[in-house]
Amino acid sequence: MQGTKNLTQGPINRQLFTLAMPIMATSFIQMAYSLTDMAWVGRLGSESMAAVGAVGILTWTSGSIALLNKVGAEVSVGQSIGARSEEDARSFASHNITIALLISVCWGGLLFLFARPILNIFELKQHITDAAVTYLRIVSTGLPFIFLSAAFTGIYNAAGRSKIPFYISGTGLIMNIVLDPLFIFGFGWGTVGAALATWLSEATVFGIFVYKLRGKSAVLGGFSFIVPLKKKYTRRIFKLGLPVATLNTLFAFVNMFLSRTASEQGGHIGLMAFTTGGQIEAITWNTSQGFSTGLSTFIAQNYAAGQKSRVKQAWRTTMWMTGVFGSLCSLLFIFFGSEVFSIFVPEAEAYRVGGDFLRIDGYSQMFMMMEITMQGVFYGLGRTVPPAIVSIGCNYMRIPVALLLVHMGMGVDAIWWAVSGTTVAKGLILTAWFVLIKRKIL
């Protein structure tokens, strides 16, 4: 099939590594957008970081919703390629893009119109809320770029051409790195400058994707971006992508509640520590997400082609690699949490509280890697419900656990322990679930 790679033959370890590395690098680039903003906005002070952090919860929610079509494309297009059905692969690609555009316009409009009442949830000082509202309204107008780029990335990943999204996203990151200090400090625009820099970078990434997909060597031989939706393809995409998007979106809503609790217990410093710490923790999350996505694509093609032995070997190899990296991240956060946090927010009180977050969260990093790797296995098999059940159940347990620990007098640390403990549970439960059903499906 034109513009695709056959992953059902050849050395498994090398294929997994060459597929996962660009995806992981792309995830790091997407994370670097936030880290770049944090590194510069942090120089404005903890209040500015709190404003950007509050909006960060909502942009995380947006990215979670965008997973509907990223995962939907990776699995539906990937399985169609594995089954040698070129027509279905193209139709799934077109439908994912169309659905992504519709959802992004509706969601972006809601955030723009209701920015202030949404951000009032965090109960921040009025001037911090005002800055956050302006930031959110700018960011919300760029959501179609994010959603469509996610769908484009999923299509390329499904085709085994994960290097292309990496190069395109890298271009956007370089642009963001250049524009951030220029807009924030050079023009004196502060947090507004950070929002505009990110908006322009995301628009550039979208434009390059469109240019590549309209070129002569387009993936899948080219396909329409906007099509009338057909029930057959739409239902399959929602069946695959909706559980993933739901679990990540509900996860974001849980974090919104925990962010408010952090604000109540520790003021804007507590909120800043939680949101900024979560972005730093993305070092682990994005690494595992890269391997998980690569594993999902590999399994989707091989499972559809009946190559079950390759599926099992790929799972074992990926679990070993992510386990090693997760252990290293645990050591970094546990022993050097404050030092890492101070890179982004140099205020003493900020990196003291933030260092506590990273230390406590560090105990769960290996288990986070386990959970996200297992998500990739289930997604590649077309079974997206089990990860959703485990993730939603454990994530919502964070709320009563956090409230209980707060009631016991643990203060803002209660939230950190609730997050860490439930992350351990998710990794263990999802791995055990797969081990129990492995013989039946493989």
Model-derived segments and spans:
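Short alpha-helical transmembrane segments in multi-pass integral membrane proteins
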Residues: 1-23, 77-144, 186-242, 299-364, ...
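Short runs within selected transmembrane alpha-helices of multi-pass transporters and secretion channels
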Residues: 70, 74, 138-157, 165-173, ...
